[in-house]
């Protein structure tokens, strides 16, 4: 299955600023015609995180779907983004009150970099063996390390 889409129209539509690549629902979309191995490893780490979050959300979602409402099944593909968003928001509030410099987008950048998902991907993107050596749920170890 093709998971990297180069020169993606969707990537060009949704990405802004210096961002050129995104992992979206398990697919890697990029504005570029080719990616470095470092960027591919970074985005593949996000792919693994996404599928692990789907696994975590699957059991409660299926149970709630049978006993409450089938709408709970939407939690499975959205859990990664919900977790990412909540984590980013908490980090944003933290950095609003603790950073010396608030203007110029620094708070948002600091909140983005403080994400457990981003920390794992960024710290291991230069290791060519990381994806083979990586343990399930490795991103969980980065919580609380702002």
Language-model segment annotations:
Residues 1-3, 37, 62:
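Nuclease and nuclease-like effector domains acting on nucleic acids or nucleotide cofactors
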Residues 2-6, 11, 66-146:
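Metalloprotease/metallohydrolase-associated module, dominated by Zn2+-dependent proteases
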Residues 10-11, 35, 55:
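Short, solvent-exposed loop/turn segments at secondary-structure junctions
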Residues 29-32, 53-57, 64-65:
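Glycine-rich loops and low-complexity Gly/Arg-rich segments
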Residues 44-60:
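Catalytic Zn2+-binding segment of zinc metalloproteases
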């Amino acid at each position: 299955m093709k998971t990297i889409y180069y020169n993606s129209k969707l990537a060009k539509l949704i990405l802004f600023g210096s961002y050129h690549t995104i992992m979206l629902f398990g697919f890697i979309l990029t504005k570029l015609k080719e990616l470095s191995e470092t960027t591919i490893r970074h985005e593949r780490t996000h792919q693994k995180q996404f599928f692990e979050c789907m696994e975590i959300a699957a059991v409660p979602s299926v149970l709630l779907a049978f006993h409450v409402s089938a709408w709970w099944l939407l939690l499975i593909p959205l859990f990664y983004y919900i977790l990412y968003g909540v984590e980013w928001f908490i980090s944003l509030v933290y950095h609003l009150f603790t950073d010396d410099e608030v203007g110029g987008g620094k708070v948002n950048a600091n909140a983005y970099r403080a994400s457990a998902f981003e920390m794992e991907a960024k710290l291991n993107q230069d290791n060519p063996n990381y994806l083979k050596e990586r343990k399930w749920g490795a991103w969980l170890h980065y919580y609380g390390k702002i």
